[in-house]
Structure formats: C-alpha cells, structure tokens
A protein has these predicted regions:
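N-terminal secretory signal peptides that target proteins for export/translocation
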Residues: 1-4
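Bacterial N-terminal signal peptides
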Residues: 8-19
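Contiguous beta-strand segments within globular domains
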Residues: 28-38, 44-52, 206-212, 231
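Non-catalytic cap/lid and distal C-terminal segments of serine-dependent acyl enzymes
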Residues: 57-97, 102-582
C-alpha cells in the first residue's frame, strides 16, 4: 500500500539561497487565480491532462515534491485540460478543487513558493469500446511529480492575497522532466521486457511487462540445473530492491527516518542490502530465481496482478506470458509445485490473490501486511453495511473515520483527507494514488469508461451496487469461503498471513475477519498460518526477532528457507529436486 517517496525528490537548494531570498523580498503579487501555459518549444501540438498548481511555504525543495498524506503536506489545486494549445493559458481559479484547502480563496494572504505542472494524458481506444484519456506510465512507476514528459514551471516566491482583484498570475511550464535511464545489469541481476499480446489487445496499443531477475549463485556453472521461481510482489521496482554488490559507502551522510525514528537509516539499508548479496552468493543459501515485476498501468505503479475491467488482463498476462518467458529464458522448472510468491502491503495482497486466482500455479504465498483482503474492513469501512466512508453513522455527530495513524495511534490523516488529496490531483480516478487504484482494480467500468466509484469522492456516500461487484470479484476472504469446495484441496496449507496490530493503515482489521473465515473452513481445513505482531506498524512480515525497520529489509532471507520447507512437504513424486541443490 505505502509508496515510499522518491529519493531524488529531496533536492538540496542550498546553493540557491541568495537567489531565493532575493526572490522572496521582491515577490510579485497575485490574487486567487493563475494562468498556466506552456511554450511551443515544449509542444507544438495541443495537450490533454491535469494542470496542477502547487503552493508551499517551504522553499528547500520544489512544491511538486511536497504533497503528502500527513500534516507536513503543502497545497495542490487542479483542473482538467483537453486540447490545451501552446501559449494558451489554463486558468486555475477559486473553482479549482484543492487539498488540503478546498479552494484558493481559503489561502491566508502571504508569500508562497509556487509552481505549476501539467500531468499529460494520452487517449486510449480500449477493446471494450471505451475511449479514455489517462496518464501513461513513462518508466517512473506512475508518479506525476517525476513522470518523464510532464511539464512544469520553475518555482518562485509569489505574494498571494485572495482579496486582490487582479488578472490571473502567469506561470509558464517551460521545464520538462527528462527520461529515466534503464537500470544496469550485473552477473546476478538481469532485466527483461516483453510486449504483452493480451494487454496490447485490451488497450489498443503496445503494452509491455518488465521484470528484474535475481540469478542464483552458480547459474552459469550449472547449465543443466533448473530452478524454482519466487515471484516477489510489491510496488514498481527500479531494479532488484534491497540488493547491493559492493560494500556500504563509509562516507554516506546519515539521514533521519521519521517513520522508524532512526538516525542513519540509509546506512542500515546499505548494510542489509550488501548482507543480502553476501548471503545470496554464500554457501548453503537456496538456489532459486527471484523475480520482481514491473506492471504499471495508467492508474497506478502496479496492476495488482489480477484481471480487471479497467486495467485489463494483467493476471493472465503475467502468468501466461511473462512468467513462462522468464522460466524458459532462465531455466525455471516451470511447474506449480516449484513456484512461490511473497510480498508486503500491495505485494501482500497480490501474493494472496495469485494463490487464490491461480491456485495450481503456486505452492505457497507468504502474505505480509496485505491491502484489504476482506472488504468488511476496507481499512476502517465496511462497504457492505456502512452508508458513508468518511464519517460514522450518527444522528447528531459527524465523527470522521481515520485514514492513517502513527505508532502511538495518533491520527495523521482522515479517510476524507486522503480521498480529497486524490480528487485534487485528478478527476475520474486518475490520480495514480492508493484509493484510486483500488477502485480501478476492483470496480466495473462506468458508462464513461472510467472506474465506477465505490463512493462519491467528495461526500463519501457508498454505492452498494459497486460494493456487491467488489465482493463477488475481489473480496479474497469471501471468495475463499464461497469457492472452498474447489479451492480447498488446491490451497490447503499454502496461505501464510502476517500483519502488525498497529498497522498504520488499519490493515490488521481485514486480517481479523479473514482469520475467522479461514478457521471456519472444513473439508479440507485451510491449515493457514495467521500471525500478528504486537505493537507492530506497517509493514510487519512475521519476524518476531527483529524490529520492523530491519525485518522489512530481509524478505528473501526470511521466506526462501520457508519455501524450501514447503517443497520438502509438498512436491509430486519423480520431479527434479536435486539439480538446483548445490
């Protein structure tokens, strides 16, 4: 669920302090409207997309990198543009929806660090007959603030006073975000990219799937060995995550992790990344293929690895096109008993979904801190019974539902705030953020071709017909119970679920419901493992021996030995369990 901020987004502007001070002292005045345009040099043709006005009080980094869920966030206001011509301004006024302030008229008069940005859309002619305008992924993992090709303005100090009656203040989008270079290959890390016929047919244009493959030690020296495959699910990986082939940098300046309350966490990450390399290449570590896939959609950095009315057949594309290609190219065993999956958060949901929707293709799923696996607890909302997602039902009170909490239970964002942030960034579920992708994955397509909302994004009113669709198609707990007669013999003993009881996004609530369902399954029993971390936050993964900050860096060392145990317990007779054991 949680997407970490891009490290490069934290820009050091110390060298520009004199310029910033001068700009601040001479800040021009603006009212409550801005005229945002781009020059012909950036595009000679009209553009579609979302114009964002970003307003901040902090000039140490660009405003586009300062929009967040928590109290530290700055301001964003957005409007859609269709066919915006070069040189023609788009007017961002008090009518533009904003977050966390809903309108520019609500800004207190003062000096602000201001920037404009255009998140560009392209037109898709889908196989279902719908024509939609969406932001394509450009190799960045669906992040509008750093998407190659997006246009933006140089930040500047501006005095904003909504009381002023002056012409819209001009902002020129004369900067463009550059392409992202491809990752390097090494002896152990390879990269593949294939065109998916299934997805290309759905989207009406070429669509590609990518993957990073971590090759086992001795791969070249054992040409006849065939290996088990581990699908490590998670958000869009730039390369194999948590992997480093050189010793930690002794000169690395220590950072400070607010999330884990640790100084020098960047040094810890390097240490454990190098430790993985040493373990992986050392004697005795199981020899397997680890695969991390890139499957961004126009709605998010990740498709959730299932077939979907709005994203297309990503589940089948991964399982019928990408995985067989990798197994053929890298000598995978290519049978369900020798495939496994694990992941945390989004990856946790995907791991469980892969085992449920493709029960014969995997021999075990290790599911850490999963996104909601039972929609009776869609974080803190029961979409089948509640009428409003943002507030508790009450005749007299308007108690907001929490959306995020810290390690002490302090609420840092409400559900309404989280959804209004997305609504400011984009209309029609195109923000590329968390709640919009859940909706894109789980919902049917609406009459306009965009995901049918589970609730009114502005008010929180739940659409029960959409909730019913979600239950039948993607409520993993419900589907297990409904289809246990056929699923039971194929997933018995294969589900391992872990979550912290202080999960920052309340994901433990859905696990409680799912555990009750799993315990009640009979003929055969589920034999599922469900474990909880006391006082553990997002994303606890079942390690009772290490703090969360450390255990999240050790997924492969934790789960691959457990995979070996599963192979010993559950494999067909007369299969190759020896060639890869060296």
């Amino acid at each position: 669920m949680l997407r970490c901020s891009w490290p490069g987004a934290v820009l050091c502007l110390v060298a520009f302090v004199p310029v910033l001070v001068a700009q601040e002292s001479k800040a021009p005045a603006a009212g409550a409207s801005f005229a945002v345009s781009f020059p012909r040099e950036r595009s000679a043709t009209p553009l579609d997309g979302r114009v964002l006005l970003l307003v901040s009080t902090d000039s140490t980094k660009e405003p586009r990198f300062q929009i967040a869920d928590g109290p530290e966030t700055q301001l964003v206001f957005g409007i859609d543009v269709d066919g915006l011509a070069p040189g023609k301004p788009a007017i961002v006024s008090t009518a533009a929806f904003g977050y966390p302030l809903k309108s520019l008229r609500d800004i207190q008069p003062g000096r602000y660090w201001v920037q404009g940005l255009l998140n560009r859309y392209e037109t898709y002619h889908r196989a279902d007959g719908h024509v939609v305008k969406l932001p394509p992924d450009m190799g960045e993992g669906q992040h509008w603030e750093r998407k190659p090709g997006n246009l933006y303005s140089t930040p500047r100090w501006i005095r904003i006073d909504p009381r002023l009656r002056v012409p819209p203040f001009p902002l020129k989008l004369d900067q463009v975000i550059p392409p992202i270079p491809p990752p390097a290959e090494t002896k152990y890390v390879n990269h593949v990219r294939i065109q998916s016929e299934l997805l290309s047919r759905f989207w009406g244009r070429p669509v590609y799937l990518g993957a990073h493959i971590l090759l086992p030690e001795g791969f070249d020296d054992h040409p006849h060995a065939r290996y088990p495959l581990v699908l490590s699910h998670g958000h869009f990986p730039e390369s194999i995550e948590g992997w480093r082939e050189t010793p930690p940098d002794p000169n690395l300046a220590p950072d400070s992790s607010a999330r884990f309350r640790l100084k020098g966490y960047n040094r810890i990450q390097e240490q454990y990344a190098y430790r993985l390399f040493k373990d992986w290449t050392g004697p005795g570590f199981p020899r397997v293929l680890v695969v991390e896939i890139q499957h961004p959609t126009p709605y998010y950095d990740d498709s959730y690895a299932v077939n979907s009315a709005n994203n297309g057949p990503y589940g089948d594309a991964i399982m019928k096109e990408l995985v067989p290609y990798i197994e053929q190219k890298y000598r995978g065993i290519g049978q369900g008993w020798a495939r496994f999956t694990y992941g945390g958060s989004t990856g946790g949901w995907e791991a469980m979904a892969a085992q449920v929707f493709y029960p014969d293709d995997f021999n075990g799923a290790w599911v850490a801190c999963p996104d909601p696996i039972d929609f009776r607890a869609y974080t803190v909302v029961n979409i089948y019974q509640d009428t409003n997602a943002y507030r508790l039902a009450s005749r007299w009170k308007r108690t907001p539902r929490p959306g995020q909490r810290d390690w002490l239970g302090q609420v840092t964002a409400t559900l309404e705030e989280l959804n209004h942030k997305e609504l400011a960034i984009a209309s029609r579920g195109r923000s590329g953020e968390q709640w919009d992708i859940w909706q894109a994955v789980f919902s049917p397509a609406g009459d306009d071709g965009y995901p049918k909302p589970i609730w009114n994004k502005l008010t929180g009113k739940i659409d029960r017909s959409v909730a019913d669709y979600w239950r039948e198609h993607y409520d993993l707990s419900y589907i297990l119970q409904r289809d246990w007669k056929t699923l039971g013999p194929r997933v018995r003993g294969k589900l391992h679920i872990y979550v912290g009881e202080a999960d920052n996004y309340y994901l433990n609530d859905a696990v409680y419901f799912a555990e009750d369902v799993l315990k009640g399954l009979k003929d055969p029993p589920a034999d599922a493992e469900v474990d909880y971390g006391a006082r553990a936050e997002h994303c606890w993964n079942g390690d009772h021996t290490q703090p969360n900050a450390i255990s999240r860096l050790r997924y492969h060392q934790m789960f691959i030995p457990r995979i070996m145990d599963q192979i010993r317990k559950n494999h067909p007779p007369d299969v190759d369990t020896l060639s890869w054991r060296y």
